[in-house]
């Protein structure tokens, strides 16, 4: 793609997210969501492959329908109560319709079916954008109206998403689909805390983005799309192998890595609010997710393909990729647990 067109599309996508996150009016928030969607669709379909075309069509239909539902809920609320302010959503139908629309945009269960198929049909960097940046605007709108959303809806969606994300990732051999189910599971943890402690939802989102970015950037740098490709990661770089291992374990929530922070705090908050059965079920579903993270970790770091080369030194490809973003992402994804008291103040 022409660099100028690429710059315009990325700038429009960033502008749409900023417009939505800073809006207090329903129309401007909807415009930001639409700008975000229209900017990402050419990026999805730029490979001129049938799978990419199919993914862009699916993405457009899902996002257009959910954006229309967002606008409908705003119009109904304005018609009944005379206010376009996001924080003054008082109609019950508008609350449920808006929550459903934003859950569809995020890919929360049970409206998650589009996310794995779309991530599988696009390049890894495009999948990274969809799994991280495209979640910011809908999540920001949910955080703005957190005190207006019915709590049972968020708890049901959260638990369902963690179950679907954990079970769906178990039998996958495609890494992009695995990351899609990982995204669904993490979004389930976020939405569970939406009406109980929105600050924990924001903390979870802030940690989820660098952890997922680090994992998928290493997949891109090592050209790993399947579990079979993951076996070759050690032949690219020992550093990439180590970071891939740690980023996956951090996504799984193992201490003492950064991914343990949100799970620990969320389970603690659920217990404080007398939702111990909910906390127990979410802890069990976290083990399902950890299972497929450990599976990828074992295959990518502890197994090597057959080799007939009688040399002790393992040969590696010479990398020409830009790795300047990896140190910062690694720092955030791995080493934040000691400053947990500072993050929760």
Curated annotation (Swiss-Prot):
One record GO biological process: mitochondrial electron transport, NADH to ubiquinone
Residues spanning the membrane: 1-21, 26-46, 60-80, 96-115, 122-144, 148-170, 201-223, 242-262, 274-294, 323-343
Record's catalysed reaction(s): a ubiquinone + NADH + 5 H(+)(in) = a ubiquinol + NAD(+) + 4 H(+)(out)
MF GO annotations: NADH dehydrogenase (ubiquinone) activity
InterPro entries hit by this protein: Complex_I_Subunit_2, NADH_DH_su2_C, NADH_UbQ_OxRdtase_chain2, ND/Mrp_TM
Membrane association type: Multi-pass membrane protein
Main subcellular localisation: mitochondrion
Descriptive protein name: NADH-ubiquinone oxidoreductase chain 2
Family indicated by similarity: Belongs to the complex I subunit 2 family.
Species for this entry: Varanus nebulosus (Clouded monitor)
Subcellular localization(s) per the UniProt record: Mitochondrion inner membrane
E.C. number(s) listed in UniProt: 7.1.1.2
Keyword Transmembrane: yes
Keyword field: Electron transport, Membrane, Mitochondrion, Mitochondrion inner membrane, NAD, Respiratory chain, Translocase, Transmembrane, Transmembrane helix, Transport, Ubiquinone
One Pfam family, short name: NADH_dehy_S2_C
Gene field: MT-ND2
GO CC annotation: mitochondrial inner membrane
Task performed by this protein: Core subunit of the mitochondrial membrane respiratory chain NADH dehydrogenase (Complex I) that is believed to belong to the minimal assembly required for catalysis. Complex I functions in the transfer of electrons from NADH to the respiratory chain. The immediate electron acceptor for the enzyme is believed to be ubiquinone.
């Amino acid at each position: 793609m022409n660099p100028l067109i690429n710059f315009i599309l990325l700038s429009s996508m960033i502008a749409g997210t900023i417009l939505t996150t800073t809006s207090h009016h329903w129309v401007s928030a909807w415009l930001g969501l639409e700008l975000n969607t229209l900017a990402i669709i050419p990026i999805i379909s730029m490979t001129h492959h049938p799978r990419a075309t199919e993914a862009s069509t699916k993405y457009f239909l899902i996002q257009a329908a959910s954006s229309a539902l967002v606008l409908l809920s705003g119009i109904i609320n304005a018609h009944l109560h005379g206010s376009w302010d996001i924080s003054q959503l008082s109609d019950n139908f508008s609350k449920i319709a808006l929550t459903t629309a934003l859950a569809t945009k995020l890919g929360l269960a049970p409206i998650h079916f589009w996310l794995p198929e779309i991530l599988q049909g696009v390049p890894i960097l495009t999948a990274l954008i969809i799994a991280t940046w495209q979640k910011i605007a809908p999540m920001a709108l949910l955080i703005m109206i957190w005190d207006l959303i019915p709590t049972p809806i968020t708890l049901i969606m959260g638990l369902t998403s963690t179950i679907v994300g954990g079970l769906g990732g178990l039998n996958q051999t495609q890494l992009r689909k695995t990351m899609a189910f990982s995204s669904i599971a993490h979004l389930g943890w976020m939405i569970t805390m939406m009406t109980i402690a929105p600050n924990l939802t924001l903390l979870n989102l802030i940690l989820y983005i660098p952890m997922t970015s680090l994992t998928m950037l290493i997949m891109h740098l090592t050209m790993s799309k399947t579990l079979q490709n993951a076996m070759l990661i050690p032949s690219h770089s020992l550093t990439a192998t180590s970071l891939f291992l740690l980023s996956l374990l951090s996504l799984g929530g193992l201490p003492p890595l950064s991914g343990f922070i949100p799970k620990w705090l969320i389970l603690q908050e659920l217990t404080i609010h007398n939702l111990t059965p909910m906390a127990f079920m979410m802890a069990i579903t976290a083990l399902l997710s950890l299972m497929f993270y450990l599976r990828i970790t074992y295959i990518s770091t502890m197994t090597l393909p057959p080799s007939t080369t009688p040399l002790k030194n393992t040969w590696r490809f010479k990398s020409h990729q830009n790795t300047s973003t990896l140190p910062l992402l690694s720092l955030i994804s791995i080493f934040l647990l000691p400053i947990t008291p500072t993050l929760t103040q």
